[in-house]
Amino acid sequence: MSLSHLYRDGEGHMDDDEDERENFEITDWDLQNEFNPNRQRHWQTKEEATYGVWAERDSDEERPSFGGKRARDYSAPVNFISAGLKKGAAEEAELEDSDDEEKPVKQDEFPKDFGPKKLKTGGNFKPSQKGFAGGTKSFMDFGSWERHTKGIGQKLLQKMGYVPGRGLGKNAQGIINPIEAKQRKGKGAVGAYGSERTTQSLQDFPVVDSEEEAEEEFQKELSQWRKDPSGSKKKPKYSYKTVEELKAKGRISKKLTAPQKELSQVKVIDMTGREQKVYYSYSQISHKHSVPDDGLPPQAQPPPPPGKEARAPGFALPELEHNLQLLIELTEQEIIRNDRQLQYERDVVVNLTHELEKASGALQQEQRAIASLSEVLALVEECERRLQPGCSDPLTLDECARVFQTLRDKYYEEYRMSDRVDLAVAIVYPLMKDYFKEWDPLKDCTYGTETISQWKSLLENDQLLSHGGQDLSADAFHRLIWEVWMPFVRSIVAQWQPRNCDPMVDFLDSWAPLIPVWVLDNILEQLIFPKLQKEVESWNPLTDTVPIHSWVHPWLPLMQARLEPLYSPIRSKLASALQKWHPSDSSAKLILQPWKDVFTPGSWEAFMVKNIVPKLGMCLGELVINPHQQHMDAFYWVIDWEGMVSVSSLVGLLEKHFFPKWLQVLCSWLSNSPNYEEITKWYLGWKSMFSDQVLAHPSVKDKFNEALDIMNRAVSSNVGAYMQPGAREHIAYLTHTERRKDFQYEAMQERREAENMAQRGIGVAASAVPMNFKDLIETKAEEHNIVFMPVIGKRHEGKQLYTFGRIVIYIDRGVVFVQGEKTWVPTSLQSLIDMAK
């Protein structure tokens, strides 16, 4: 191994004697600095690359670098290095590594102007940089540099509420003086020279740290087993634990804790003591003795107090300590176990007490239920006994009703939970059959209504009624009506004649609020409608003296849309009867007029256009207009149908069959030197034959205006040598008067419409706010003259059904549903109005 490292300087270079040669041996320094990025390297200069080993070196041309050798300074004093004080290569490399970590780039590799000069150790040179002899400066001049600045930091602190001389924080709780540092005496570890607290720390925190108290307590406990050299016996200090403290702590010893299965066979190596020990489960660790060390190391033992001699450390009894500690822990565990067992037993007592109270309450409730059921059973058995034939005191229907009333009022729970259907079938049904045995509904339609109303409140199932069901096995009242009351109704309807409709209508009107809805529907659809349909098929309008509407229309409030299938055969029979009809026969109007509001507007208009309007047109065609001898019968026959035939159809007849002939007669009359006063009367007479509704039609108005124009042209022309005096003025006055009447009529119509709109607006404003959707439909029905009324006893899914004209609807959450062919279809309000029209 080479000893060249003994002659290296602090920078790792060779001495001056060895400048002329280079040693190629690998030293420890080379190995340790192999991967050191800051190690010194030789950078080949341009001259060395050109001349090789013959290159001359000039100290003036050299420049500082990070890896090359620097020039020798022969003016510096000679420094000798003692071989005995020279550090080893390894220690020197460690020092260099530590220096490299703190300062990767050496200061002497920079130009001379950079930083302080390197401290020299010999000669006449002094250190170029002074050290801090007294540590840090006093804090008296802390922040004095702000004198030479604008003091922005102090200003910002003062704006935020800082007061010079006081601490920081909202309540000035911060420290005022900087934290002082205390220099340790020697090079020992922390705490080796006692407390290191400063005067400032003692002033701010006078309380002794808990660690010092723990250390003192530990030393006292450690010295209890040591013999006092002075011979004085000190009274030992004992710590006592009460039973209440143990209960509050609730500690369970680890010895009672059963080890987990996965941890029971685990190899454990204990290296906490002087020797290595191996355990094969964690439970074995808990059984080892806590053997203390023989004593503290000499350097860790506290020095003896002044005035006393040092004592030898006392002896230790680990087995005795272990046994005593084991007895203490077993006692504590026994106390805790007993306390938990006591608490458990108390909880069991409380739980059993609650269960006993609950069982007692259930027992009392069962006893009350048994007593109530016994009383109910006694009442029922009494009713059954009185129902037996040959009983001296037979049961009546009123007495049975009182028994059921008692059951409902006094024993409501039992009455609600009992099977009322079987009870009613056994007791009530026989009495009810005897009650209606001689009843004739057509003669006395109100017989039994009060009795049925009373039994409805006693037997009807409210839950079933709310769901809209018709389960006969669950509702005693529905079953009573179906099995007892319906047979009498079927027998009466079978003998009833449809043309004698009033008694049957009165009977059903009286019973509709009492009987179930589905029973009423069954009567109307299965019993009444087939009878009416059969009677309509046999009806002959030419031979029957009783009009059909007299025995069909009374069923409209009850059946409503169910009568729609009857309207088509009625219209066909009426149409066949009108084939040979003449407008002079007024009986046709009497027969058809009641059906105008029953048929839909479209079907009624089609019927009139097909069967009536052609007959009226033929009658107008036969009308002869003769101013001197006028026959008005044909005209009266046509005008008499104005309310039955629509205005448009009637105006069409007049335009086609009346006005052409009327204007032709007027022109002929004016061409023969007429008397204009007579023409004026004739004109006004014909105009008075029409109603205001017909005169307001634009076509009729145009025809009469055309007649006025013809008369004006006649009087204004020069045809004829002789002109009646005042004729022109008379015709002009007539024209002006007629035009003014038309204008006044139009103004009056507009004013009337405005008043109606105003009244309608006032009515809407005066109505209840907010107005629901049903009120809105009702208002629209009034505006369009449409009948809107509820269907008595008719519901769909619990919703009330209404008739809107001839349409059946129901309202659900602001939506109108219209009855279609198979399902209910939602529609808008305007579509509903259009369908009703």
UniProtKB/Swiss-Prot annotation:
Gene Ontology molecular function: any one? nucleic acid binding
Comp. bias regions, Acidic residues: 14-28, 91-102
Chain spans, region Required for interaction with DHX15: 1-50
Q: Where is the PTM Phosphoserine found along the chain?
A: S2, S59, S98, S144, S210
Limits of the G-patch domain: 149-195
Q: Which GO terms describe its cellular component?
A: cytoplasm; spliceosomal complex; U2-type post-mRNA release spliceosomal complex
Report residue spans for region: Required for nuclear speckle localization: 710-734
Q: Where is the composition biased (Basic and acidic residues)?
A: 1-13, 54-64, 103-116, 217-231
Report the residue ranges where the short sequence motif Nuclear localization signal is annotated in this entry.
700-705
- Tell me which Pfam families the record gives: G-patch, GCFC, TIP_N
Keywords in alphabetical order:
Biomineralization, Cytoplasm, mRNA processing, mRNA splicing, Nucleus, Phosphoprotein, Spliceosome
**What compartments host this protein?**
Cytoplasm; Nucleus
Q: Where is this region: Disordered?
A: 1-31, 54-73, 85-136, 183-236, 287-313
Q: Name one GO biological process term.
A: biomineral tissue development
Principal cellular location given in the protein's record: cytoplasm
Report quaternary structure and partners. Identified in the spliceosome C complex. Found in the Intron Large (IL) complex, a post-mRNA release spliceosomal complex containing the excised intron, U2, U5 and U6 snRNPs, and splicing factors. Interacts with TUFT1. Interacts with DHX15; indicative for a recruitment of DHX15 to the IL complex. Interacts with GCFC2.
Homology family: Belongs to the TFP11/STIP family.
Function of the molecule: Involved in pre-mRNA splicing, specifically in spliceosome disassembly during late-stage splicing events. Intron turnover seems to proceed through reactions in two lariat-intron associated complexes termed Intron Large (IL) and Intron Small (IS). In cooperation with DHX15 seems to mediate the transition of the U2, U5 and U6 snRNP-containing IL complex to the snRNP-free IS complex leading to efficient debranching and turnover of excised introns. May play a role in the differentiation of ameloblasts and odontoblasts or in the forming of the enamel extracellular matrix.
State the protein's name: Tuftelin-interacting protein 11
Source species of the chain: Bos taurus (Bovine)
- Gene name of this polypeptide: TFIP11
